[in-house]
UniProtKB/Swiss-Prot annotation:
GO biological process, one term: glucose catabolic process
Protein name from the UniProt record: 2,3-bisphosphoglycerate-independent phosphoglycerate mutase
Top-level taxonomic group: Bacteria
Source organism per UniProt: Syntrophotalea carbinolica (strain DSM 2380 / NBRC 103641 / GraBd1)
Key words, A-Z: Glycolysis, Isomerase, Manganese, Metal-binding
Binding site for substrate: 126, 156-157, 188, 194, 261-264, 335
Binding residues annotated for Mn(2+) 1, in chain numbering: 403, 407, 462
Any one annotated GO CC term: cytosol
Leader peptide range in chain numbering: none
Cofactor: Mn(2+)
Binding residue positions for Mn(2+) 2: 15, 65, 444-445
Molecular functions per Gene Ontology: manganese ion binding; phosphoglycerate mutase activity
Function: Catalyzes the interconversion of 2-phosphoglycerate and 3-phosphoglycerate.
Amino acid sequence: MTVEIRRPVALVILDGWGINPVCEHNAVCQADTPRLRALLESWPHARIGASGRDVGLPDGQMGNSEVGHLNIGAGRTVYQDLTRISLSIEEDTFFENTELRKVMQQVVESQGKLHLMGLLSDGGVHSHMEHLYALVEMARRAGVEQVCIHAFMDGRDTPPQSGAGYLAQLEDKLQDIGLGRVATVIGRYWAMDRDNRWERVEKAYRAMTEGVGTSFESSAAAIADAYAQGQTDEFVEPRFVGGEKPCTVDDGDGMIFFNFRADRAREITRTFTSSDFSGFSREKTPRLAGYVCLTEYDASFGLPMAFPPETYPELLGEVVSRAGRKQLRIAETEKYAHVTFFFNGGSEEPFDGEDRVLIPSPKEVATYDLKPEMSAPAVTDAMLERVASGRYDLIVLNFANPDMVGHTGVESAAIAAMETVDACVGRVVDAVLNAGGSLLITADHGNCEQMADAKGAPHTAHTSNPVPVILVDPDRTGVKLRNGILADLAPTLLELMGIDKPAAMTGRSLLEPS
């Protein structure tokens, strides 16, 4: 039987919506979500692997938004930068990297300092400590005499007060290698902003360049003082280590940013490298011997990168475009890069026939537990307007709330976030069905389905749980969905659209005829 091709086909991504059989401290379970529950009861659904090897990460590694959207858009399991870089260390090719060797040689020649900055974490979302250790060892081999480490504290992808342990591990490792010192300790809230909150970035920048902030004799003392003041890792106010002689960024120094994820690396990189920077007034602009990004943060930067991006032919967006179909990407600021840049394989450029809608995320609150609805109602309004236009064949929509509010660790707020998203999903489903379309509702990784750890403390990180997928299509009521992985979503969408799957897509459609 020939199935009618419905349009639009909507991919609705509930960011951070995972499956957890335990209801306690589970915002998904605790929330009153009548529309999502009805969808799960009435329409075909299955489970999707969104972590570890299923998305090209190491075994057991939790998924994240960048990895999730990259896998979804590629229609294949994508070998992630974390795995790629770690493998190069194992194989010793890391220590022959051209750009890393070059900046270290420049520092030796200028008799400057080498600054290594990034997220001190083994969370594997933005960085990994093993990469930092390899850089210090490489600097030792290269003859670099001074290595200064600017340690950005995590607390989102790791427990909120795990930073003290990570700093202790780092200090032990530096002792073993015989090179390097911690120069600054800064919460990621300040150093890794991605929403143009330049007042935050300025505090981190001034700590690194001018030594502005409280001085401590050791990294252990710095983090202990932060905890004593009620600051968890993410929010540790910039402080420098070394007493009278802070290890600041000066003329002739070199810098390596060891984060491999792009979105939260752009602003601080722009602050150090842009000649026409306007985010704030820089009191000091060091003339650097070199600046190397571990991966490509933004193609427009034109900066050296140790691991250039890999290309992925025949992405979902490209295949839809070549078929002459129109597509839309829509999200609020916090997830806009994910439905555009990451979904398109790390490319900023839209495909022909691809439109984009950006709804600003709230700026009037410091953390989203204070506004758990975020901009979801406005995103929904914009979505419904575009559905009504009848222009689009494929719409990719992201609701940020379950992830961004989940990261705060405030369970009541995460429950409110899920209830907001439930109402918004209901409006979207009604509009798409009324327009003659169909939907796949899913997530990129888990988060808010676990809001406390085993000890009952707030859980602010992603999870390695599977995520749901629901097919809402009145013409396919007899279809069953099989369990799969994120890479299977693109082939499924193409089948719903009546477009042949390209050879480069190794994912398989989730549709199983009954």
